[in-house]
Amino acid sequence: MSKQRIFIAGHRGMVGSAIRRQLEQRGDVELVLRTRDELNLLDSRAVHDFFASESIDQVYLAAAKVGGIVANNTYPADFIYQNMMIESNIIHAAHQNDVNKLLFLGSSCIYPKLAKQPMAESELLQGTLEPTNEPYAIAKIAGIKLCESYNRQYGRDYRSVMTDNW
């Protein structure tokens, strides 16, 4: 039996590298890893060609343009555009190449600024987002909705999880 081929987009980041370490310990999977220089996730053709040639079975989507408050305030268009492109390119290419399992890493910033604590999943889209990272949050919400839409329309198993700082 061949090993499952798992692509980790963002394997050098904090969450992606933790996922990589856990999967490496299993030993029953083959990890497919590409650096930013090896695969430009903003290039839809490159992402599609990568998926078409690599026979990927599962995807962990941890890649994102991230930054602090100053970066988010200074480059809001870059944050929303680049994150939506990364998510759209990977999710669509995964679907086109019959990858049925995908895990999208969201962010706790998708919850409203004044959400009750502890936050409940039902708080999503129920209030105003924190203005300092709203474009990033909107891109992350778009990724969640992309996963939900591919599941509903195509019967995929694309899931979203929100991490926090606990």
Label each PLM-derived region with a short phrase:
Residues 1-166:
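N-terminal Rossmann-like NAD(P)+-binding domain of SDR-like oxidoreductases, especially those catalyzing
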